């Protein structure tokens, strides 16, 4: 999982994306939406240069691997450039740490098949909000959601937080942060299970929230220490899922793999 603070202007970001992605970004009227769209695609290319993103029938992102490597930006280095504005909190790697090369073979049907240590990274989760973009890649279904930690949920909270869930709020967690943590967790699960029409209040239920050890980022990332690490247990669509949440620079982030 990687989180990107969007410091770049639109033109430098566009240079890290394919022509098709640049055209798709241009369809957004709002400059912020164009930046966020370009940023998460650039981050995907930095993490996994061989991959592009498409969408399934439900609109969720999926990884695709053009076998000929066509339409790949020539200046993508296969690593994480601009090291001051990206961090991978699950590994401690930051933006000047280069991604490992991922070898490919092909199936008898001609489809690209990843091999080696990171095989097969078939799943992707994406989120972007207020000048940040996040991408998670995994061999298993995965999802991520980010939101400003100080978002005002005073009117909406009752539509996605049950009294039982409210009672789970850890004493050490600031009261104003709790709704953002729950919102991100439920949004991540909604994207994870990919079943349209689920109710955040009734169908996606948080059953446990436990503090985790706060982690310190390596020097040179440009990010302060990650805060408010929590592990959440969530039930949805007959499944029990484990998620991890943290805050950094006023952004709440929750992600899960499994």
Over which residues does each language-model region extend?
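Core catalytic alpha/beta fold that binds nucleotide/phospho-ligands
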Residues: 1-258
């Amino acid at each position: 999982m990687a989180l990107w603070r969007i410091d770049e202007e639109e033109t430098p970001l566009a240079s890290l994306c394919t022509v098709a992605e640049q055209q798709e970004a241009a369809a957004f009227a709002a400059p912020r939406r164009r930046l966020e769209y370009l940023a998460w695609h650039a981050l995907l290319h930095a993490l996994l240069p061989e991959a592009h993103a498409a969408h399934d029938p439900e609109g969720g992102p999926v990884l695709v691997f053009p076998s000929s490597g066509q339409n790949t930006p020539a200046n993508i280095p296969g690593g994480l450039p601009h090291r001051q504005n990206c961090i991978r909190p699950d590994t401690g790697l930051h933006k000047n740490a280069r991604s490992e090369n991922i070898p490919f073979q092909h199936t008898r049907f001609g489809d690209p098949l990843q091999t080696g240590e990171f095989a097969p990274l078939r799943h992707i989760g994406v989120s972007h909000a207020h000048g940040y973009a996040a991408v998670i890649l995994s061999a298993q279904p995965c999802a991520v959601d980010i939101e400003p930690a100080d978002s005002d949920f005073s009117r909406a909270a009752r539509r996605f937080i049950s009294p039982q869930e409210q009672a789970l709020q850890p004493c050490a967690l600031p009261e104003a942060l709790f709704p953002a943590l729950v919102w991100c967790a439920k949004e991540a699960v909604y994207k994870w299970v990919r079943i349209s029409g689920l109710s955040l209040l009734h169908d996606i239920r948080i059953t446990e929230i436990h503090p985790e050890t706060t982690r310190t980022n390596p020097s040179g990332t440009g990010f302060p220490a990650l805060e408010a690490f929590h592990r959440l247990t969530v039930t949805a669509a007959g499944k029990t899922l484990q998620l991890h949440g943290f805050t950094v620079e006023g952004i709440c982030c929750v992600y899960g793999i499994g």
